[in-house]
Regions:
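Collagen/collagen-like triple-helix sequence repeat recognition
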Residues: 1-44
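Short glycine-rich, low-complexity segments
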Residues: 30-78, 82-170, 174-204
Length: 204
């Protein structure tokens, strides 16, 4: 008769077999967080306008200013303050006018200002401007802004700028800064600060 089966022995492990074929691609993962926004020439124009308004409040507190909007509307009064307060707020978005008694009047969106003219004053050479951003703004808006400044360089006489269906500035180009042109009358009178992002029709 056959005897009992003996204990199973463990042999030496054989060599590793070849790698199998690559499996199917897994599903696409979740979209990552949105990166930081690139430079916008529109923001640069607003920053330059805010910078100038802050200085107008300091240098021309008793003078009347005329603010032309991109829509064609106008507002006038004395320069009051930037809002939200204080005037040094780097994120201020409104410019508030006052009447002759210093009582606050309408608040104006800085993002919609085409120009601001100081009708009864002389240009103050102490006014300073923000430099062009680094890295430079890109895109269609930057192309238009650069073309406007190129078309109306400093010293251009009999220049006129139209926005919102009205002439918002005319005279001689005194300054050409990033996001802004300054036009003046005889002897640097009645300076007008124009956003190059809002200028529409240019003549010279």
């Amino acid at each position: 008769p056959t005897g009992a089966t003996g204990a199973t022995g463990t042999g030496v492990t054989g060599a590793t077999g070849p790698t199998g074929p690559t499996g199917p691609t897994g599903p696409t993962g979740a979209t990552g967080a949105t990166g930081a926004a690139g430079n916008s020439v529109e923001c640069s124009c607003v920053q330059q306008m805010r910078n100038i308004l802050r200085q107008i409040i300091q240098l021309y507190p008793q003078d009347n200013v005329i603010v032309a909007m991109e829509s064609g509307n106008n507002a006038s009064g004395r320069p009051g303050s930037l809002l939200p307060a204080p005037n040094t707020n780097p994120n201020a978005g409104l410019f508030q006018l006052t009447n002759n008694q210093g009582v606050p009047q309408e608040a104006i969106s800085i993002c919609r200002i085409a120009s601001i003219r100081i009708s009864s004053a002389i240009y103050n050479n102490d006014i300073t401007y923000l430099p062009a951003p680094t890295p430079s703004d890109t895109g269609c808006g930057a192309d238009c802004q650069n073309a406007i400044r190129s078309y109306l360089p400093v010293g251009t006489t009999s220049a006129a700028i139209n926005a919102g269906g009205q002439t918002v500035a005319q005279g001689t180009v005194l300054r050409s800064e990033y996001g802004m042109l300054v036009l003046v009358g005889p002897n640097n009178s009645s300076p007008t600060f124009v956003s190059t992002c809002k200028a529409e029709i240019l003549t010279k």
